[in-house]
Amino acid sequence: MRRPKKYESGEATQYISRRAALRRLQLSLNDFRRLCILKGVYPREPKHRRRAQKGSSEIKILYHAKDIRFLLHESIVWTLRDYKIFAKKSGRDRAIKDFRNLKRRLALFPEIKLDHIVKERYPTFIDALKDLDDCLTLLFLFSTFPSLHLIPREQSALCRRLTIEFLHYVIASKSLRKVFISIKGYYFQAEIKGQKVTWIVPHYYPFKPQSRQDVDFKVMSIFVEFYTIMLGFVNFRLFHGLNLAYPPQFPSSVLQDNSETLQDESSFVSDRIAALNFELLRTDKLMEDEEELDIDMELLEQDGDSKRIIKMKQEAQEVARLRTLFKGLKFFINREVPREPLIILIRSFGGKVSWDASVFAGATFDESDETITHQIVDRPSLSTQYISRDYIQPQWVFDCINQRQLLPTNKYFMGEQLPPHLSPFVDSKRETYIPPEEKALHDPSLIETHVQSDDDDDDSDAEADNQEEEEIEQQLLDAQLQRAYQQETAEYKKYGGTDGVNEDEEDSVDDDDEEDEEEEEEEDVEQLDDKTKRLLEEKQKMKVESGKVHKVNKRQIRKAEVDEHRLQARMVKPRHRNLFRKLIREKQTKEKEEWLLRKKRRNIDADAKEAKKTAKREAKKAAAEAAAKALKMA
């Protein structure tokens, strides 16, 4: 039997370097990267790098040998090789100026088919929905790009079309659940087929060119190439699940015979689809008014009343109310407000929305409409205002959705300082410090207590302002009471201090009564049995003693905790010691962050309180000066 040699089995044969993979596949580095991105193959980190690299200590990029064997059977490899042949032959035709043959070759340009790869990577529709977060975020980003060297115009236009189609599904299904505004953009979370899908829509800023060292647009473009095919499949399935025509179409009532439709119907339809403000054509009219619920309430009622079932019922009822949050409300968006994110939010929750017709196509009513309930503005003032509507800032819409109720609009009026905008994506179980506003977001019953604490602060400020007046009144009252007491004492001495009864006689009468009572008690005790006598004797022995105050020494308690912690650290096994230190370091970092946040919050509250006091004093001072001026004028 032959003795096995070193590195012929085990971990050394499970991995292969990138250079060896390129030789085996006979591809260039760029083609290999493209193939790995499309197939979902990525580098691996071995457990023992020296063994995996057959004794070499050099840092190499390693792949699973099984993944490389998997790539050998991919049909795209032949298409990538055809690209190389096409480049050589077209370059030769261009060099000899054989443009006729070059035109023929360009018509036969090899194309990569990715349909089978999408089906291979996502066997079920739920698998595709689970991987939809990165897909949507990247496509929304590329939909805002202009035509670049590595990003053709057709790719950006395709990303824009697919993302608009997906937003139409979100609006029609009313599946939006959470929203948030940040520096990166607008965060959206929808619940589709029981899966939570989260994506980011970037802010609409002018495009700033990036250097090649910062962003590799070529690699990102390969991801987009795969994700466009994937999202096309997903949109097709989602639209047919709601009986919506795909590609999106409008009912005949929208396509009226006017000048715009007669000139160019395709551009008219595409503009209205991009406006996100019209209902789409349904293939089945019976399903138009029916809305599918994610949870079957009748099935839940049959399952009993366990805690889990009750929680699911409550969640289903909250979602049903949330889907009609803005029902019956009409919004008008001003020019300075971002149009598309607010249209998605308002229409996803049952509201009606419009804007200035000169900004974008698809406006359904004007600003002068008297039935408008809310106008969304982002400026300090307006020249003309209507009494029948509320002028609010855009944050009101986001906060109402996150708290699942219509909030009062007084804090969001035009020109007002907005309350803090809290993220609904924070996990309260993992975070150590939770501000009071966020607690109120997760538990609406805490809003009243938070408001009550603010009122208590105002009351304490008012008490501090009126403290001097109360002290003066108390001094006057004490002087009056002292004078009354002196008068009563003088009258008591004047009339002899008695009511005609001698004190010695009263004391003798009291002593006789006490002796009679003691004799009666002794007679009663003699008549009782021995057990009762014993109980009475024990009761007489019981007495109340003065207690002692035990002072808590915090330093000793802290020292005991530190000693216990050191004992636990010594008991940790040596192989787990690094992990233990890492956990302790993370815990200390969290505690420090919590302490800093609490300190920062205390400073902010103190500054706000001081500013409030200063404003009150200035207001009182101004009122006093105005009153003095009025007296002088009088």
From Swiss-Prot:
Keywords: Coiled coil, Nucleus, Phosphoprotein, Ribosome biogenesis, rRNA processing
Coiled coil: 460-546, 596-629
Protein name: Pescadillo homolog
GO terms, biological process: maturation of 5.8S rRNA from tricistronic rRNA transcript (SSU-rRNA, 5.8S rRNA, LSU-rRNA); maturation of LSU-rRNA from tricistronic rRNA transcript (SSU-rRNA, 5.8S rRNA, LSU-rRNA)
Record Pfam families: BRCT_2, Pescadillo_N
Compartmental location: Nucleus, Nucleolus; Nucleus, Nucleoplasm
Purpose of the protein: Required for maturation of ribosomal RNAs and formation of the large ribosomal subunit.
Annotated organism of origin: Drosophila willistoni (Fruit fly)
Ranges of biased composition (kind: Acidic residues): 454-473, 501-527
InterPro entries registered for this protein in UniProt: BRCT_dom, BRCT_dom_sf, PES
Gene3D superfamilies in UniProt: BRCT domain
